Design a protein with these regions (language model features):
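Rossmann-fold NAD(P) dinucleotide-binding segment
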Residues: 42-48, 52-76, 84-86
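Hydrophobic beta-strand scaffold residues
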Residues: 26, 72-73, 96-97
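C-terminal substrate-binding/catalytic lobe of Rossmann-fold NAD(P)-dependent oxidoreductases
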Residues: 2, 10-43, 123-169
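Anion (oxyanion) recognition and catalysis
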Residues: 20, 66, 91
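Rossmann-fold NAD(P)-binding glycine/threonine-rich loop
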Residues: 63, 76-99, 105-119
Length: 169
């Protein structure tokens, strides 16, 4: 498979290493320093663009790849208020797009457990959900996309709450 990488930081390097070890070809690795290469024939030849950049670049990265006919798998977070625009572009262009706040199998099992537990809590109004997350010092977005997904699923499943806040208490 021909893969373009959008965001060539820690995750981009890890994706490259794994992809190459499995016999895939990296046709482009786009970052802030070479953003114009997204217009290159090499980028357009990709079967998929794997996008792990940052909140300020993710939306444009996804849209630019889709406009060039390249399918996108994105794991960047803290920009998803613009997901509806990306989905509209996918529909208009007949493109392919997958986004998740976390691709870890273990975390996705945790997401499902979280949804089930939140639904069960509807029967117990004496309990209120609360969440606290701890990260390494280099974490760029906080709350993390994983925490935002968990909180959103709780809000969706619990009839007695209609939102969440980052404030403690």
């Amino acid at each position: 498979m021909k893969i373009a990488i959008l965001g060539y930081g820690k995750m981009g390097h890890a994706i490259e290493r794994i992809a190459l070890s499995r016999g895939h070809e990296i046709v482009a690795a786009i970052d802030v320093d070479n953003r114009s290469e997204i217009d290159s024939p090499a980028f357009a030849s990709a079967d998929v663009a794997i996008e792990f950049s940052n909140p300020t670049a993710a939306f444009d990265n996804c849209c630019d790849a889709l406009r060039r006919g390249v399918a996108v798998v994105s794991g960047s977070t803290a920009w998803t208020d613009r997901l509806p625009e990306v989905r509209k572009l996918v529909e208009e262009r007949g493109g392919s797009f997958i986004w998740s706040s976390n691709y870890s199998l273990g975390v996705n099992i945790f997401f499902e457990l979280n949804r089930r537990l939140a639904a069960m809590m509807n029967r117990f109004p004496q309990y209120a959900p609360s969440m606290r997350e701890i990260h390494h010092i280099h974490k760029l977005d906080h709350p993390s996309g994983t925490a935002v997904s968990l909180a959103g699923d709780i809000v969706e499943a619990l009839d007695r709450i209609d939102g969440w806040t980052e404030e403690e208490g």
